[in-house]
């Protein structure tokens, strides 16, 4: 019995509130000088009435604020882990709509990102096509990062990266890809053209189709080349893509060429 009493006494001591400047006694209990609510309360334990420490209103608000801040910190860590897991290229993790030029192409992609829940439920993706260097990869990555910001798993990769990833088999590739609610496959048509590559490309896209999960593809191929490929082995792949993804033509300027020109101007200025 003495052990129980000693333990109870220890709990009571630990529950004793800290008296701060402005605190006061009222009705035999300690009150907070800030919020005017009690920092002590009376509790009946057996035949005895004990005075124990309790949280005043402002202490409770502080505790809730700390809990919220910790939950937000944990969520930021979780999102960052998802981002690192889904986007191997560190630079691509920084592609955001906030840093993008406000163009019609970007606005359309932003609408898709803003309504991703609808796209996820419908299993609808995008096919971003157009000439090289006009921002397709950037825009697709902006969508992925916007989705990740909401804590939804997304992956940005390419078939060359997948094919060189050292997977044990195609089934392992499919399982890995389907962990992500959004999959961005960059530069379709740039992969090696051999039987293994062909089957892997088809398997990834077909498994995505079967899973009902959205897929965003970027490509330099035209819609005509996708509808009527020179290599008929790709017909079933491109048919799947056109079935799953809404085509969005990127008519933007060649940003890589513009950047190259800017770099050249900078160099010329240095050489003056």
Q: What spans do the regions from the language model cover?
A:
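Short loop/turn elements that form and flank the Walker-type P-loop nucleotide-binding site
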Residues: 121-122, 150, 177-179, 210-212
């Amino acid at each position: 019995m003495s052990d129980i009493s000693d333990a109870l006494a220890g709990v009571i001591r630990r529950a004793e509130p800290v008296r701060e400047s402005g605190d006061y006694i009222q009705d035999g209990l300690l009150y907070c000088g800030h919020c005017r609510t009690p920092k002590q309360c009376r509790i009946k334990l057996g035949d005895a009435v004990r005075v124990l420490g309790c949280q005043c209103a402002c202490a409770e608000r502080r505790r809730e604020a700390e809990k919220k801040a910790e939950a937000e910190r944990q969520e930021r860590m979780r999102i960052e882990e998802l981002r690192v897991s889904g986007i191997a290229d560190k630079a691509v993790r920084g592609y955001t709509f906030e840093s993008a030029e406000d163009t019609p192409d970007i606005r359309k992609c932003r609408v898709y990102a803003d309504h991703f829940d609808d796209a996820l439920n419908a299993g609808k993706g995008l096919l971003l096509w157009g000439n090289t260097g006009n921002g397709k990869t950037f825009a697709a990555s902006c969508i992925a990062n916007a989705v990740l910001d909401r804590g939804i798993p997304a992956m940005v990769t390419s078939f060359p990266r997948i094919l060189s990833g050292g997977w044990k088999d195609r089934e392992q590739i499919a399982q890995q890809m389907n962990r992500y609610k959004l999959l961005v496959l960059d530069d379709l048509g740039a992969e090696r053209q051999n039987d293994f590559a062909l089957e892997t490309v088809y398997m990834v896209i077909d498994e995505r189709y079967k899973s009902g999960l959205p897929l965003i593809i970027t490509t330099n191929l035209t819609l005509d080349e996708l509808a009527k490929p020179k290599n008929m082995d790709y017909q079933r792949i491109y048919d799947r893509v056109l079935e799953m993804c809404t085509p969005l033509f990127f008519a933007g300027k060649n940003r890589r060429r513009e950047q190259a020109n800017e770099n050249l101007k900078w160099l010329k200025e240095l050489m003056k």
